[in-house]
């Protein structure tokens, strides 16, 4: 049986990856340490999802590990024949990153470097899938020729990005936020390991992801958090741009 390693296995994308891989016949090693609870509080904890995966999936092997621990990460790879890496673990919030830039960079950039090095040393042929973010583009999209209507900001229908921004957009010369910088650093590392060491790496620059396992909190996971506010009657605040910003959600 093939072995896949999924980091952030209790999170939204990580947990769905675990389920799909197990269904496809893989043995899945899930790396998780519930840092989301320390970032955003107990309502954002991934522990319930991790416990549910462990109790319902026979081929799921949970490993409690902080990806900033280079020796621990290396040991996980050295002790197993890993044939696929799905790296979703991250500190995912702009605001939180500004509170503690060192932790943000440590998790997002150094943690990714630790995984890449371990993969290079022990599983160089394993596809390495990295969940990057559209925040690597910084505020460049704000300088597009946006049209302000009564309810939203929109691009002209004949604009090349009307149906979405592709990876051709530059990530340079923009304000990224500290979170965007740490994720852009990781994104570039994943690309460079692919090119320089000829490893099969890929970056997915998603944004506004949601789904049934999302532990939404005010600082991250806005759609899940919005639904939570609707159900509980809690006020929901939209910040900036007069509430006219437009986001495409990926389920």
Predicted regions and their residues:
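A glycine/serine/threonine-rich, flexible loop-to-helix segment
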Residues: 42, 143-145, 216-225
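A conserved pocket-lining segment of Rossmann-fold NAD(P)-dependent short-chain dehydrogenase/reductase
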Residues: 97, 163-177, 201-215, 226-250
């Amino acid at each position: 049986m093939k072995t896949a390693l999924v980091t952030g296995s209790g999170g939204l994308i990580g947990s769905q990856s675990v389920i799909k891989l197990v269904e496809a016949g893989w043995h899945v090693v899930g790396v998780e340490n519930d840092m989301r609870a320390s970032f955003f509080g107990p309502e954002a904890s991934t522990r319930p999802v991790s416990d549910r995966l462990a109790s319902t999936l026979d081929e799921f092997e949970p490993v409690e590990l902080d990806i900033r621990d280079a020796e621990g990460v290396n040991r996980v790879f050295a002790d197993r024949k890993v044939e696929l890496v799905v790296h979703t673990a991250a500190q995912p919030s702009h605001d939180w990153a500004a509170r503690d830039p060192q932790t943000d960079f440590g998790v997002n950039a150094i943690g990714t470097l630790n995984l890449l090095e371990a993969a290079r040393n022990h599983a160089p042929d394993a596809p390495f899938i990295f969940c990057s973010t559209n925040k690597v583009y910084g505020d460049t999209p704000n300088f597009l020729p946006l049209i302000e209507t009564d309810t939203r900001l929109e691009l002209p229908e004949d604009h090349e990005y009307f149906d979405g921004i592709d990876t051709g957009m530059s990530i340079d010369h923009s304000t990224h936020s500290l979170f965007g910088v740490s994720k852009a650093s990781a994104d570039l590392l994943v690309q460079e390991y692919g090119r320089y060491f000829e490893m099969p790496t890929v970056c997915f620059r998603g944004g506004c992801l949601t789904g049934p396992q999302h532990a939404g909190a005010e600082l991250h996971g806005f759609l899940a958090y919005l639904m939570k506010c609707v159900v509980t009657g809690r006020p929901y605040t939209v910040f900036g741009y007069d509430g006219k910003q437009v986001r495409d959600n990926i389920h």
